[in-house]
Amino acid sequence: MIRARTFTDARQQAHSNAELHWWIFMRISGLILMFLILGHVYMTFIQVSESDATFDAVVNKLANPAWKFYNWLILSLSLLHGANGARYSIEDYVRSRPNRAWVKGVFYTVIALLFAFGTVGLFSI
């Protein structure tokens, strides 16, 4: 686990390249997610008046492939970002190796199911 604020410190603390890449991913994905979600909130709640937010308007918006990809990008990045953050917590609080393996296995299965159901739900509209 890397507990660093700067890239130099992170590189010194990393036990593997994968751990360093996850550390970098968390910084980049957090920044990207911030702009994606702010854009989504603006386009969904500020740009559209409340009277125009009908079921048909939402279905028409989600029929657009660009809007589907935008939502899928938010879904996939947020699940990866959240799963990696939860991995840090699991490593910190589940001390026993066998228990940690079980907790991670169940957790990653739930994340995979959320991703699969979210993707199917998003692209079936």
Describe these PLM feature segments.
Residues M1-I125:
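Membrane-embedded alpha-helical bundles that constitute the cytochrome b-like, heme-associated redox core
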